[in-house]
Amino acid sequence: GLVDSLQHAIGVNGIYIDQIAAAAPEPCWNEAHGHPVGGGDFWYDGYRRLIGEIRAHHLLEDRILTSEENAECYIDLFDMLLVVNTPHEEDNCIIRPVFPMVYSDRAVTSAFTYTPSEADKMSLGDFRYELAKALLWGSQIGWVDPVPLMSEQAVSEARFMKTLTDFRRSLHDVVYGGLFIRELTPAGDNPIVKIPGFGDDASVLAAEWRKPDGRKVYIVVNMDEKKH
């Protein structure tokens, strides 16, 4: 099968299976299928059996499975979940960290939402904002188009991303097994800025976490080039 060949022929360390944790189930109206017509758990149950079979009989030791998005009914079957499709608008739709508040100690996520795809838009503020939010909510920083990121216009943004990824490496004892408690807005010198696609927010963002041993940790990110 495909999972076997990817591991044995190519030697991958992880396998990404698109859509499973993202796509909503479609109703089935076939009366001969043995489930309630137009309902039932066949979609969810079928995927769980499929992924369970892969994990039990095909996935090699120290390999991981990932999928798109973070449907609750599959989080125990995947080692990481890519979160990028959350809708957002400046005025009408604000992303709130409900999922990490509930599942941060039981699910590993990657990314936050789609990042800019053009070099001249990398420095408008939303790129840094998305990376900062990913870090604060415990998500692995990533899902970034390398072409605009490595352009001359994005040198400072690339440096900002490298700083956050290096910093996150020191937080493994917090974000893996720890619990996201809340977002914070630090008081004092903390100017409000307009983030394209997200609206107004503070330049310095923060979050409170609780480590597995019960200790509190505060993560603070300054998105500005200036000190605050």
Task: State where each predicted segment sits.
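Active-site-proximal substrate-binding groove within the catalytic cores of carbohydrate-active enzymes
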Residues: 43-228
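Active-site neighborhood of glycoside hydrolase catalytic domains
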Residues: 2-77
